[in-house]
Amino acid sequence: MPQKTSDTPMMRQYMEIKNQYPDAFLFYRIGDFYELFYDDAVKGSQLLELTLTARSKNADDPIPMCGVPHHAAQNYIDILVDQGYKVAICEQMEDPRTAKGMVKREVIQLVTPGTTTDKSAEDAKENNYLTAVNFDSKTKKYGFAYTDLSTGELKVAILDDFDSVINEAVGLQTKEIVTDESLAESFEERFKELNILVSKQSEVEISAELSYLIQDLTSSTEIEVVKQLLTYVQTTQKRNLAHIQKAVAYEPSFFLRMDHASKYNLELTRLIRTGKKQGTLLWLLDETKTAMGGRLLKQWLDRPLIRKKEIISRQDRVQVLVDHFFERSNLQEELTKVYDLERLAGRVAFGSVNGRDLIQLKTSLLQIPKVRHILEELSEPVFDDALEHLDPVSDIAELIQNAIDEDAPISVTDGDIIKDGYHAKLDEYRDAMRNGKKWIADLQAQERATTGIKTLKIGYNKVFGYYIEVTRANLANIPEGRYERKQTLTNAERFITPELKEKERIILEAEQKSTDLEYQLFKEIRELIKKQIERLQDLAKQVAELDVLQSFAVVSEKYQFVKPTMTKNHAIEIKDGRHPVVEKVMGHQSYVPNNIDMDDNTDILLITGPNMSGKSTYMRQLALTVIMAQMGCFVAASEATLPIFDQIFTRIGAADDLISGQSTFMVEMQEANRALKDGTSNSLVLFDEIGRGTATYDGMALAQSIIEFIHQNVHAKTLFSTHYHELTELDQSLEHLKNVHVGAVEQNGNLVFLHKMEDGPADKSYGIHVAKLAGMPDKLLKRASVILEKLEAKDQAHSDGVETPVSKATPVESEQTPTMIEEQMALFETPTKPVKSSPKEEVANQLEQLNLMDMTPMEVMNQLYKWQKKLRK
């Protein structure tokens, strides 16, 4: 009976290893390739666009297979991991040429979305966080820990509820979360809805080498979740983790808190529409020059400060850098030459660092004395702490300078990595190699002269070693018996001589010894650097902080931001405030600034005005101003006085949660409820059009109730925009509410947005005018105008002589009267066709009615630009 293809020793070995990693693609090393078999091959060929073939094609049970070259494997692994898959890398643990029987193979690493460390250059400013969560049944709290294996960062927190877990995980943009059996299945499903891979780690046991990482933790909840995280890391990585830093406990309430919906709505790091960084607040603020500075900026954006002393400390350092342009420019220039110290230290620990990495490390360290000199020149006390901690790690820089060749290759096992003069024995081997190769060159010249064959050459390959090659046309010129024939080619013959083979032995022996010694020396150097990883990580933190501060200074000067005054009272006073991102996109000249004035007696601004007039921008503008101020950055205004907020809640936009089947209205109510439940008098609440997702009266009733609840119970500073104009009467009964509106005027039937916030309620919503700006057909717009007039007339008929407070909604008629039927039919009458003015007539009419004395020069210029654009069309 023939043997099944799956019953060979190699395939039995494959299945044994695969069964240990059932949820991962197994990259199984065979020679120079990683092979995938069975379902891995079928699915992998589709995801990686590889040709699907088969092992033992002609057998009754051929095995599906595909493969990738080992030198290109990382790209394919990245593709799979980026799509949320795990990859188990199975290596040959012995040389197939010397192995007795089946080659021993082992999985040396399990690469997962949360543990991948080989980040591309475009991801250099992104952290890749692996998180862990468990539920402590005794305290009824959640343990939450995270690490970035590429940088060694390790942090832990105790969270009150699962919503807080979600907020932390989404804020970190984690791709993988490690759980145990304590977490409810429904919670795991929530992670999956957010495209977070859930990995199980039930057994918890960390090695003695890592136990020191938890020695500063006091809570059992913190200790257990960190151990859970580290156990998973140990199990999957199977590598040295010397660069992992001691676990640091943090308290989310020590920072300005924003739930994931608020961060999403405010587009802090990703645009809602495109998912890209460009057009976000992070994009605007990022003038960092180093990868670790870029990552720290994002961390500061995710967690602005709430302690006034810390905020002022950052502001003061930014002010110094704003005031010293030349020193700041020099600092930027030096930081540009600093590579990613955090990830270089990580590669040293992992043992994956190469010669080029060490040259980058040396180059970076050599910039630190120059950075110190710039700070010393500033001679400002606010930078004394930075100077104290900017350790240039000069001993490591000197070691690399003396040992590693500037042109070191990527490979660490093929030689040419250690400098001449670093090690005497290595120099001896190299001299032997160089003398031998000179002897080869001399022999080639000698043989050409002796034989008269000018094309004779001496070459080398790994199969035959050194050889003498002569073309067929010149074979007759070789003296009889001079060479020993070794290989026949199509157009040439290759020969050897005893003397050549002896010299080959000497050269190759020297080469092998040289290469082996170089690798040994490189490993010794790597171990010396590994002992200084903590110093390198501390230095990286100092450089990153300097980088973010100079970035704040650059954008503050470039966009004319001002240093905000942070107060302990609750008043907000912003003069000429701007939305910094919108201003950058539009250009400074065309942006209309706005004031925001909410004294201690004003808790709620009720905002009315047309669609597209800038209500949402005005609200986001305040949120971004608060976030920037509490990050320590300057803000987009001419003056700003702000309280320190503890939380920001937003409901802006109508992004349905389609994945979990929740409607716009349900999401709206949930997001509003978070503010009502968790908000305090120190919070900022931004509600845009609450209630629009349901019937008119329902929406209006809910909107009013929410406003009243905030006014009477929460007392948070609140911006509440609405189309329910009836709500503007609330200022009569709610003493801490103030009406404002976005100005707009009609000119010859056209709507002109002033984009200026004015006191009092808006008189109209101008919906049809906005539809006109959107390009809807004239016929439709005219019809809408007729319908609107009829509806307004009907509403007036019902309300004439009767006071209708917001709290008493007008009842709906249960029966239709003949008059009402006639009114409804009239809505569908064919309207008369309007006479449309020419662009020149429209401009002339607008110019005639313009009051130039009430306009600023900039407003006049903007109006002229609009007219010119219209006439050119």
UniProtKB/Swiss-Prot annotation:
Q: Where is this region: Disordered?
A: 797-817
Which Gene Ontology MF annotations are present?
ATP binding; ATP-dependent DNA damage sensor activity; damaged DNA binding; mismatched DNA binding
Q: Which residues bind ATP?
A: 609-616
UniProt entry keywords in alphabetical sequence: ATP-binding, DNA damage, DNA repair, DNA-binding, Nucleotide-binding
Q: Name one GO cellular component term.
A: cytosol
The GO biological-process annotations, alphabetized, read as: mismatch repair
Q: Which domain of life is it from?
A: Bacteria
Establish whether keyword ATP-binding is in the entry.
yes
Q: Which InterPro entries match?
A: DNA_mismatch_repair_MutS (IPR005748), DNA_mismatch_repair_MutS-lik_N (IPR007695), DNA_mismatch_repair_MutS/MSH (IPR017261), DNA_mismatch_repair_MutS_C (IPR000432), DNA_mismatch_repair_MutS_clamp (IPR007861), DNA_mismatch_repair_MutS_core (IPR007696), DNA_mismatch_repair_MutS_N (IPR016151), DNA_mismatch_repair_MutS_sf (IPR036187)
**Annotated function:** This protein is involved in the repair of mismatches in DNA. It is possible that it carries out the mismatch recognition step. This protein has a weak ATPase activity.
- Which HAMAP family does the entry link to? MutS (MF_00096)
Q: What family does this belong to?
A: Belongs to the DNA mismatch repair MutS family.
Q: What is the protein name given in its UniProt record?
A: DNA mismatch repair protein MutS
| Gene this chain is encoded by | mutS
